[in-house]
Amino acid sequence: MENPSIDFESAEFALRQSWEIHRQAFGPILEPAFVENQQVRILLINALNHISRREVKRGMELLKEIHPHCIYDEDKAAWAFFVGLCFEMGGARDQMLEWYEKAGEIGHRFYLPYLKLAKAAHAAAQFEKAKDYYQTAIECLQEMSENDKDEIILGSAYTNLTSCLTMIHQYPEAENAWKAAQQYPAQPGADATAAILYAAMGNAEKTAEHINGLKEKFPAWVEQTQQMTGQILSGTHPAFPK
């Protein structure tokens, strides 16, 4: 007769393995959640297993079971984020953003939802809102350990922050963000961001320098950037009146 403890040990190993996979992906929002309720954590792991396999309906059902056990803000923020993740995996972008916003309002230190909210606001030309989200995402990234910190994402976030600050005419802050971006791997087309910033600051020499950088690294953006920076420098661009 088989020893039933073998099955128990296998299940426990699978559970620990699943937790570690999800912790690596979502650690800053997952680890503080449901610390005092291991049964709910098991339910959450199960929900995340389904969500990761794009079995969104089952994942959402399990999240609904978890909801009554959300006691602390850490529980509520994680729950709202994972509801947003369900909608994201299901292709429902508006609902995804709505729930990521709710998670942010409760408060958490996971960069990813803030970055997604920043990019959505940026694409909608809501530059002030995007700036705030980029700054929060950067703060969360900087709080991570050196081993976990993603330098490519940090460089991209700082470059996009530069763009938003430029569009709301906060040029000293934009230049500081641009200088911070230079500490990380260069982003494709980043010279376009710098060219626009320096054109807005009236620095034709630095604008030309970054357009030359574009010619070498990202020629597809040269014509559009030259046109925009030319308008900015001449005072004819509507977003940058003299």
Regions found by a protein language model. Name each.
Residues 24-36, 67-76, 140-151:
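Flexible helix-coil transition and linker loops at the boundaries of alpha-helical arrays
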Residues 71-74, 108, 142, 185-186, ...:
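Short coil turns that delineate tetratricopeptide repeat
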Residues 41, 75-78, 112, 149-152, ...:
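Start-of-helix register in tetratricopeptide repeats
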Residues 208-242:
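Terminal, low-structured helical/coil segments at or just beyond the last alpha-helical repeat
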